[in-house]
A protein has these predicted regions:
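Aromatic- and Gly/Pro-enriched helix-to-coil junctions and flexible linker segments
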Residues: 3-117
Length: 117
């Protein structure tokens, strides 16, 4: 999931803390209503199925956040690297601007806790 490493990593090194975010009753966050825009804004400049080789800036192959199935397969890693809750803010990703504010990272944690609908 590294975006600045010159060589693609085999597996990302996870350095964050689980957010233990919860899915609140009535959460309306979905990939279509929120997630796709979040990932397009902050992540897919590296984590995109349309990027290859050096265009991925070190993001491992298969870690494509413009593909909901890939996001769901890597929910734990995304939580550890980029999500937030009331008590925890992981900000390993993205490594450069634009970076999401804490409020958006908290929405990411909520959305992941809800199963990434």
């Amino acid at each position: 999931m590294a975006c600045s490493d010159p060589e693609p990593a085999k597996e990302p090194v996870l350095s964050g803390v689980p957010t233990d975010s919860v899915c609140p009753a009535g959460s309306k966050l979905t990939y279509d209503s929120w997630g796709s825009t979040f990932f397009a804004t902050y992540c897919t400049r590296c984590h995109s199925k349309t990027r290859e080789g050096e265009q991925r800036n070190g993001a491992p192959d298969g870690y494509n956040w413009d593909d909901l199935n890939s996001v769901r397969a890597h929910q734990e890693q995304i939580d550890l690297m980029a999500a937030a809750s009331i008590d925890v803010v992981n900000h390993e990703m993205p490594p450069s601007d634009p970076r999401p504010p804490t409020s958006e990272r908290q929405k990411l944690g909520e959305w992941l806790a809800c199963g990434a609908p």
